[in-house]
């Protein structure tokens, strides 16, 4: 049977092991994070600024021409109600445009939580901090695609 002092120790041990989210910023005052989606990997830096988003050295409307992809990029900043307060610099490699947009969104979300830990609950609730692990299913031999079989002829 556990005595009272061991129960107190257990409580303090649990408090100590709970993750404390601290601000992680480099010497220039930027928060860095990586985001992933499908085969795309994005390296993202967030710093206080005017709301400019740069992807691979180009403004994001130039790099991501489709309005849907532009909206995906802005979702975390809008959800956190920080529009026009942060400059974002991202370099993204691999995958297609949709995967790259998702990777940058994931990176922006993580970097915002490193810069301002208070935003974590809002972004977590919106699902921006969760890594979307869905990737293309591989093609199997004996099949036309991943699941589609070759046409079957009875006679």
UniProtKB/Swiss-Prot annotation:
Gene3D superfamilies: 3.30.230.10. InterPro entries: Ribosomal_Su5_D2-typ_SF, Ribosomal_uS9, Ribosomal_uS9_bac/plastid, Ribosomal_uS9_CS, Ribsml_uS5_D2-typ_fold_subgr. GO terms for biological process: translation. Keywords: Ribonucleoprotein, Ribosomal protein. Coiled coil: none annotated. GO terms for molecular function: RNA binding; structural constituent of ribosome. PROSITE patterns: RIBOSOMAL_S9 (PS00360). GO terms for cellular component: cytosolic small ribosomal subunit. Transmembrane segments: none annotated. Belongs to the universal ribosomal protein uS9 family. PANTHER family: RIBOSOMAL PROTEIN S9, SMALL RIBOSOMAL SUBUNIT PROTEIN US9M. This is Small ribosomal subunit protein uS9. It comes from Allorhizobium ampelinum (strain ATCC BAA-846 / DSM 112012 / S4) (Agrobacterium vitis (strain S4)).
């Amino acid at each position: 049977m556990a005595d009272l002092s061991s129960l107190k120790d257990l409580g303090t041990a649990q408090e100590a092991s709970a993750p404390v989210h601290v601000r992680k910023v480099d010497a220039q005052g930027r928060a860095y994070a990586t985001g992933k989606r499908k085969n795309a990997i994005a390296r993202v830096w967030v710093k206080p600024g005017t709301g400019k988003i740069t992807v691979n050295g180009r403004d994001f409307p130039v790099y991501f021409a489709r309005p849907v992809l532009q909206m995906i990029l802005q979702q975390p900043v809008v959800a956190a109600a920080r529009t026009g307060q942060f400059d974002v610099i991202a370099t993204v490699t691999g995958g297609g445009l949709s995967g790259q947009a998702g990777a940058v969104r994931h990176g922006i979300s993580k970097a915002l939580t490193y810069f301002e830990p208070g935003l974590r609950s809002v972004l977590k609730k919106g699902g921006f901090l969760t890594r979307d692990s869905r990737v293309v299913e591989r093609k199997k031999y004996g099949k036309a695609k991943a699941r589609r079989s070759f046409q079957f002829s009875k006679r």
